[in-house]
Structures are given as structure tokens and as C-alpha cells.
């Protein structure tokens, strides 16, 4: 292995940064581009803000899914299920 100049910062060591910039491509070659690309693209781990997904609006005028729920018969009181004690 080549000796590393101790006066250089660790991020300036040879081989510490890839020769090409990272891009948004998710092909196999780009997923293994560097450690950051592997973590974000290959493993799908990102620690940034999560975008809020918008809710899908129901289609207008479609009442097929708006079936009313039939009421359930009321159950007996919540006391002893065997009945009142004498």
C-alpha cells in the first residue's frame, strides 16, 4: 500500500473520494459508486426529511363505497353474564 501523507486531512487522502460525482441513477454500477451511494441507493437508507404523501382524493359522485353500516343489536348489560344473583 502507498504511504499516506500525514499532513493531509482524511477526506483528502487518495481514494477517499470517487473520481466522478454521485448521481440519481439507481443502476447496479451507480449503487456501488461509493459508500454513500451504496447506503442510500443500494440499501435504501436515508436520514433526511420524509416527504409527506398526499392523500388520494376519492372520485367525485361515486357512492358505491358509501354503504351505510347496519346497526348492531345492543348487547346485554355489562354485569354478570349468568344473570343477577339472589
From Swiss-Prot:
Recorded coiled-coil stretches: none
Compartments where found: Host nucleus, Host nucleolus; Host cytoplasm; Secreted
Chain span(s) of sequence motif Cell attachment site: 78-80
Biased composition annotated in UniProt, kind: Polar residues: 9-20
Region spans: Cysteine-rich: 22-37
The organism's place on the tree of life at top rank: Viruses
Entry comment on modification after translation: Asymmetrical arginine methylation by host PRMT6 seems to diminish the transactivation capacity of Tat and affects the interaction with host CCNT1.
HAMAP family hit by this protein: HIV_TAT
Protein's name in the database: Protein Tat
Comp. bias regions, Basic residues: 48-58
Cellular component terms (Gene Ontology): extracellular region; host cell cytoplasm; host cell nucleolus
Region (Transactivation): 1-48
Disulfide bonds: none
Keywords: Acetylation, Activator, AIDS, Apoptosis, Host cytoplasm, Host nucleus, Host-virus interaction, Inhibition of host innate immune response by virus, Inhibition of host interferon signaling pathway by virus, Interferon antiviral system evasion, Isopeptide bond, Metal-binding, Methylation, Modulation of host chromatin by virus, Modulation of host PP1 activity by virus, Phosphoprotein, RNA-binding, Secreted, Transcription, Transcription regulation, Ubl conjugation, Viral immunoevasion, Zinc
Binding site for Zn(2+) 2: 25, 27, 30
N6-acetyllysine, modified sites: 28, 50-51
GO terms for biological process, alphabetical: DNA-templated transcription; positive regulation of transcription elongation by RNA polymerase II; positive regulation of viral transcription; symbiont-mediated perturbation of host chromatin organization; symbiont-mediated suppression of host innate immune response; symbiont-mediated suppression of host translation initiation; symbiont-mediated suppression of host type I interferon-mediated signaling pathway
Annotated Zn(2+) 1 binding sites: 22, 33-34, 37
Residues with PTM Asymmetric dimethylarginine: 52-53
Additional notes on this entry: NDK, isolated from a Zairean patient infected with AIDS, and is a highly cytopathogenic strain. This truncated variant has a premature stop codon. It may have arose as a consequence of tissue culture passaging.
Lineage: Viruses, Riboviria, Pararnavirae, Artverviricota, Revtraviricetes
